[in-house]
Amino acid sequence: MKTIILFVTFLALSSSSLADETETEFHYKPGEIADPSKWSSIKAEWKICGTGKRQSPINLTPKIARIVHNSTEILQTYYKPVEAILKNRGFDMKVKWEDDAGKIVINDTDYKLVQSHWHAPSEHFLDGQRLAMELHMVHKSVEGHLAVIGVLFREGEPNAFISRIMDKIHKIADVQDGEVSIGKIDPREFGWDLTKFYEYRGSLTTPPCTEDVMWTIINKVGTVSREQIDVLTDARRGGYEKNARPAQPLNGRLVYLNEQSSPSPTPRLRIPRVGPV
């Protein structure tokens, strides 16, 4: 069990809002009929993709962030290795656990790990730079509230977890909706570090672009090899070679940079749970 000081807010969303369907009607390639600039006009329920003021991703930098050394929320992780499946959804590769792979606990509420997936290049920018890849760890409570943790990667040494499942990725690379067992996977193998992280209110990065999702983005950047990036990219179907939404305007939102260590105590800051605004 690992205990981290953290403040996170959540939004109740339907499972369809996680872009879990493979019958997608949006693309990423600029100039296409369904590229990100046109998402808001494809469906009425996607209008907020163009009109929303709290859209994601954004550029994260200390210059726009409020530094926080302590918060009033405690996040505890209780992960365990269980059998998992890798699925090619066409627009990304998703890891889904067949049984209970554990949870995070915040404010005495359990949030079960639902799935993990990758975007390449990264969706969030760090100090003005779009990195090579971004991992999303999605957790959900029984009430439907989400807690999403994003981990950024730059090109460099191979990522240990992706190396472990490379042969499985190859196996379903050309199979739409293809699934393959990847054995027992411990979520801790993804290797994220919560000693320093950004948080802000944003949205889903895919339609319907629902707002008031609180993003927690790890400041420590991992590495992934060029070969691994190419394998994941090549596995996606046309229009999804780069499955990253462009950066969205900040529109005056507060961004917090939580640093776990401080030479002197700082006032504790409570971030209210997301609600109607």
Swiss-Prot record:
Q: How is it modified after translation?
A: N-glycosylated.
Q: In which tissues is it expressed?
A: Expressed in flowers and siliques.
Catalytic reaction(s) noted: hydrogencarbonate + H(+) = CO2 + H2O
Q: Where is this region: Disordered?
A: 257-277
Which residues span the membrane? none
Disulfide cysteine pairs (residue numbers): C49-C209
Per the database record, which ranges form the Alpha-carbonic anhydrase domain?
24-259
Localisation per UniProt entry: Plastid, Chloroplast stroma
Q: Which GO terms describe its biological process?
A: response to carbon dioxide
Q: Which residues hold substrate? A: T205, T206
Give the required cofactors: Zn(2+)
Q: According to the UniProt record, what class of enzyme is this?
A: lyase
What residues does Zn(2+) bind to? Answer: H117, H119, H136
| EC number per UniProt | 4.2.1.1
The record ties this protein, via InterPro entries, to: Alpha_CA_prokaryot-like, CA_dom, CA_dom_sf, Carbonic_anhydrase_a-class
Q: Could you say which residues form the signal peptide?
A: 1-19
Q: Is Zinc there in the keyword field?
A: yes
Q: Which residues are glycosylated?
A: N70, N107
Instruction: List the SMART domains.
Output: Carb_anhydrase
Q: Keyword annotations for this protein?
A: Chloroplast, Disulfide bond, Glycoprotein, Lyase, Metal-binding, Plastid, Signal, Zinc
Q: Give the Gene Ontology MF terms in alphabetical order.
A: carbonate dehydratase activity; zinc ion binding
Where does it sit, as one GO cellular component term?
chloroplast stroma
PANTHER family given in the database record = ALPHA CARBONIC ANHYDRASE 3, CARBONIC ANHYDRASE
Family to which this protein belongs: Belongs to the alpha-class carbonic anhydrase family.
State the protein's purpose. Reversible hydration of carbon dioxide.
* Name the UniProt record assigns to this protein: Alpha carbonic anhydrase 3
Its lineage opens with: Eukaryota, Viridiplantae, Streptophyta, Embryophyta, Tracheophyta
State which gene encodes it.
Answer: ACA3
